[in-house]
């Protein structure tokens, strides 16, 4: 294996979430979010504290603020969760709340985007073949937009079926392809000649990493793969998948959190 798995949490943050590769994240966001031209962004604290100590805090995969003060949350999820859409909405509430001062009569806030990169299909999009779907708050009958301050974007990579021979230079489709196939590649395909792909391949190449980073990447990918295999085995053996998946995902998130803090 020459390149690291972009859908691994640790690797995704390595390729998209560092100051040295910020241009990759900016290009990705400009491709995913329609009618935007993000020039710069700032990576922010990924942990959001709940106002109620009895309620859950939130830890994002990626959180950034753009040059126009928009807040963007990016989540990468490999295993299906029955309440994933609710989780996405829950994440958005932290970014709305944190922009409004307690006791203020002014409830204005900057736009919030939650981008979900998924290795599964959500039930809410069943029957829709589109890889990217975008949701806003709209009126039921007229579909009039209530506000453009909340945007939920889902990228269901299972719906992307194109091979390298089908790519035509579209940057977003090229990113979909890389997210699904990076570990299978021996070199950067010629069709992926945009500067953003050169950076993505350079950062994700294992031999380009320092020894500590490479060790962390390999350990993280191996642990994630082993846990997925355990869950698949449990399913085959007739063990309740939900219980096994919950335990395994909890272990993955815990390991990712520890490694991200190293």
Identify the residue ranges that each predicted region occupies.
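Short, charged alpha-helical interaction segments and adjacent helix-coil junctions
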Residues: 72-77, 177-262
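Short amphipathic C-terminal alpha-helix that caps PH/PH-like domains
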Residues: 29, 92, 171-179, 204
């Amino acid at each position: 294996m020459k390149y690291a798995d972009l859908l691994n949490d640790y690797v995704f943050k390595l390729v998209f979430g560092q100051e040295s590769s910020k241009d990759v994240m900016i290009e990705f966001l400009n491709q995913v979010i329609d009618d935007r031209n993000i020039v710069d962004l700032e990576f922010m604290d990924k942990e959001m504290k709940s106002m109620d100590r009895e309620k859950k805090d939130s830890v994002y995969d990626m959180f950034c603020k753009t040059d126009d003060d928009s807040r963007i949350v990016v989540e990468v999820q490999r295993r299906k969760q029955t309440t994933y859409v609710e989780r996405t909405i829950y994440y958005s509430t932290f970014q709305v709340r944190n922009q409004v001062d307690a006791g203020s009569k002014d409830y204005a806030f900057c736009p919030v985007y939650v981008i979900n990169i998924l290795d599964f299909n959500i039930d809410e999009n069943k029957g829709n073949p589109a890889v990217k779907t975008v949701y806003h708050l709209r009126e039921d009958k007229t579909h009039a937009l209530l506000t453009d301050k909340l945007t939920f974007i889902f990228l269901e990579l299972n719906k992307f079926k194109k091979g390298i021979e089908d790519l035509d230079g579209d940057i977003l489709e090229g990113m979909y392809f890389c997210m699904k196939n990076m570990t299978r590649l021996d070199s950067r395909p010629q069709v992926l000649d945009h500067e953003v792909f050169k950076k993505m391949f350079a950062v994700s190449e294992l031999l380009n990493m320092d020894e500590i980073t490479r060790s962390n990447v390999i350990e993280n990918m191996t642990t994630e793969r082993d846990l997925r295999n355990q869950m698949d085995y449990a399913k085959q053996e007739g063990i309740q998948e939900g219980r096994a998946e919950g335990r395994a995902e909890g272990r993955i998130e815990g390991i990712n959190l520890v490694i991200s803090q190293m």
